[in-house]
Amino acid sequence: SGSCTTKTCWTMLPKFRELGYILKEKYNEAVQVEPVRTHRNKRPVFLKIKKPLSYRKPMVTDLVYIEKSPNYCEEDPITGSVGTQGRMCNKTSSQNNSCDLMCCGRGYNTHQYSRVWQCNCKF
């Protein structure tokens, strides 16, 4: 008859922004665990939930962590992080140097500066 039927299947990843939202949600719901070793083994045998009363058992798709992330907004001499306090930020920016992002929601002081310099203009 000359007709041809073809079936093509494929899977697509979600849009990058949607994936970011999913990961952020999983990050916010991550459960702290601690490795449990037996006397003979140096490697951990399993991970135990650190606060078992307030959490359910994590699923394979959930995120878990062993140590809390450092707070990069505060100075931490142990990690060498200088924090963001006292650094200059851009009030109108939506990038990494924005005041809202750098100041971690603590608010910020604004200062207006004037600068005069010789421009060596020629007429």
Swiss-Prot record:
Its main location: secreted. It is found in: Secreted, Extracellular space, Extracellular matrix; Secreted. Palmitoleoylation is required for efficient binding to frizzled receptors. Depalmitoleoylation leads to Wnt signaling pathway inhibition. A lipid is attached at S1 (O-palmitoleoyl serine). It comes from the Eukaryota. The keyword Cell membrane does not apply. GO terms for molecular function: cytokine activity; frizzled binding. Disulfide bonds join C89-C104. Residues 33-61 are annotated as: Disordered linker. One of its GO terms (biological process) is neuron differentiation. GO terms for cellular component: extracellular space. InterPro entries: Wnt, Wnt7, Wnt_C. Glycans are attached at N90, N96. Ligand for members of the frizzled family of seven transmembrane receptors that functions in the canonical Wnt/beta-catenin signaling pathway. Plays an important role in embryonic development, including dorsal versus ventral patterning during limb development, skeleton development and urogenital tract development. Required for central nervous system (CNS) angiogenesis and blood-brain barrier regulation. Forms a soluble 1:1 complex with AFM; this prevents oligomerization and is required for prolonged biological activity. The complex with AFM may represent the physiological form in body fluids. Interacts with FZD5. Interacts with PORCN. Belongs to the Wnt family. This is Protein Wnt-7a. It comes from Alopias vulpinus. The gene is WNT-7A.
